Structure formats: structure tokens, C-alpha cells
Amino acid sequence: MLFLQFLFLDVVLGGSITKNVVQENISFYLMQISSYANQSWVQNCGSGWLGELQTHGWDSESGTIIFLHTWSRGNFSNEELEDIPLLFHVYFSGLSLEVQDRVSQLQIKYPFDIQARAGCELHSGEPPKGFLYGALNGLNFLSYQNKSWVPSPEGGNRAQKVCDLLNTYEGIKETAYHLIRDTCPRFLLGLLDAGKMDLQRQVRPEVWLSSSPNLKPGRLLLACHVSGFYPKPIWVMWMRGAQEQLETKQGDILPHADGTWYLRVTLDVAAKEAAGLSCRVRHSSLRDQDIILYWGHGLSVILITFAVIVPLVLLIILVLLCKKCCTYQGIP
């Protein structure tokens, strides 16, 4: 979900954004997981995603869409939005019946999962691209290409049989084509427009350093913590002067409850070589003002503060005790 503001303007203005802007793409897609425990039990889970941001959920009990943001409806009319849950209900019902009827024929053993990912991508200066992929128990099974169902190599003969069957249903092929090539791009543009205030927000990261003993004697594991930033794309690196430390290891970017992100970047280094290292953070919210924290500087400040405050506190306590003793001595 990179540089959404540029993408939005690029789409609306027909690709007129300066060529110096890094070209990215944005996608909207639906995720489906259907779990079949036995011949009579199936659970369908669905969700909608704008890039890496979840925008929709699916209530399988009521057969309704869950809108996770105030702008999750995009600019579709109420009539259009009412048609979509009905379409999903028909799809899930039909899929369950077909699958249960053909489990033996396809030699599929319970329990098993069917996954699907369908949506569209917008690339700067290019027409929208639709996609639809299906998987069985986590392995690629089939895809939709050029108005036809195509088996994946991992799916083997079983996938070929399913595609041969699906390709006989012209109505299903036309519906799939219409959804990923027409409906999805229109809905994606509507989401970008309706949610542009949220999607374009910039939140500066907070950065701090820490260390922990390494398993190897004489070494330290330095950690650079970056928290509370939005949007997600960020660059963090341990540096020595202008030299990037290639041994830097980046963890997963983890979400906060408020929609911002957290990242921890570490460097395994000899304790005697830690001096002179720094952590550098680049983020769109910082513009060109990178955050740079030097290892040891914060520790030095703490030690200096501790060295000044502790004697001062002790001196104050000593003075108070002396005054108290003098007071007691003056009492007859």
C-alpha cells in the first residue's frame, strides 16, 4: 500500500504524475477460505483487502458484508452493494454443492480447504489487470486467464478435470470476467477516493535503541525499535558513518491496534565495536529529515544524569538529616 496519494492522482489524472515519482501498484482483492470437515459440514470465511489493509469482512451466518471503515463502501450505490452479498451467497452455496458432489470423483480426502484470491491491480499508466487464483490445501490449483480456467502444474490431473468442467459454463466465465475487469477496478477507484483522507495520513515514527547480551561472549545484539508509523513502507538500517551494515536483520512489520506499525531491526556486533554505530530511519512522514540515533549517546546521557542527580539527592538527604539532628539537640 505504497504512496496511495500518488496512485490516486495518477489514476484520476490519467497518468500525469511526474515521472520522477517511484511507480507502484495498488490492488483490491477478496480472500476466501472454505473448510470442509466432512460431507455435511463446511465453513466459509471471506475478507476484502486494499493492498495490505483489510477493508471488509464476511458474516457467514447472516450472509452479509462487514464494512470495517466508514469509507469501505467506496462510491457504489446502495443498489449495487445489495447485489454483491446475494452474489456471494449464491456462489458459496453452489460451490459447496458442487464440491460435495464431486469429492469422490476427484479423490479428495476430508478434511480439506479451498482457498481463492480474486481482484484487480492498478498500475500507473496501464489499464487495470484482473486476477483470480484458486488453491487446494495451500497448493496452487487453478487460475482464470483470458476468459478461461487454467490448471496449475501443482494441481495435476485433478486440476485439469476441474478446469474442463468449469470451462463448459459460459455464464460463470462471463461473470468472473465482469467482476475482475469491470466491477473491481470501479470499486477500487471508489475506495481510493472515499478513503483518501485516511489513506494519505502520515504518522511519524518513534525510535529508540536497546541491547541484550549475545550467546557468544564479548558480543552484543543491538536493536533499533521503530514504532507508531504510518503508512507501512519504511527503511531502517544500522550504519557506521555513511556505510550500511549489511549484517542488519529486519523483523516482521507488526500492526498496532490503531492501524500504525512497529518494526525491530537488529545487529549482532562485537561489544568493543559498538561505538560509532547508528540507526537510520527513513519514512514518508519524515520527508527528507531522516531520524538518526547513535549507539551509546543515549546511554552516556543517562549515566551523566545519574551521576549528577544521585549525589545531589544524597546531599539533600544529608542536609535534612543534619537539620533534624540539630533541632533535636536544641530541645531541653
UniProtKB/Swiss-Prot annotation:
GO CC terms: endosome membrane; external side of plasma membrane; extracellular space
Intrachain disulfide bonds: 120-184, 224-279
Pfam families in alphabetical order: C1-set, MHC_I_3
GO MF annotations in UniProt: endogenous lipid antigen binding; exogenous lipid antigen binding; lipopeptide binding
Signal peptide (UniProt feature, chain positions): 1-17
Chain segments annotated as transmembrane: 301-321
Highest rank taxon of the organism: Eukaryota
Bilayer topology term: Single-pass type I membrane protein
CDD domains in alphabetical order: IgC1_CD1 (cd21029)
Record-annotated Ig-like domain positions: 205-292
Keyword Ribosomal protein recorded: no
Keywords for the protein's UniProt record, in alphabetical order: Adaptive immunity, Cell membrane, Disulfide bond, Endosome, Glycoprotein, Immunity, Immunoglobulin domain, Membrane, Signal, Transmembrane, Transmembrane helix
Entry-listed glycosylation sites: 25, 38, 75, 146
Membrane side Cytoplasmic: residue ranges: 322-332
SMART domains found in the cross-reference section: IGc1
Compartment(s) of residence: Cell membrane; Endosome membrane
Transcription regulation in keyword set: no
Gene Ontology biological process terms in this record: adaptive immune response; antigen processing and presentation, endogenous lipid antigen via MHC class Ib; antigen processing and presentation, exogenous lipid antigen via MHC class Ib; positive regulation of T cell mediated cytotoxicity
Extracellular compartment spans: 18-300
Subunit structure: Heterodimer with B2M (beta-2-microglobulin).
Chain's role: Antigen-presenting protein that binds self and non-self lipid and glycolipid antigens and presents them to T-cell receptors on natural killer T-cells.
Other facts noted in the record for this chain: During protein synthesis and maturation, CD1 family members bind endogenous lipids that are replaced by lipid or glycolipid antigens when the proteins are internalized and pass through endosomes or lysosomes, before trafficking back to the cell surface.
Protein name as annotated: T-cell surface glycoprotein CD1c3
Organism of derivation: Cavia porcellus
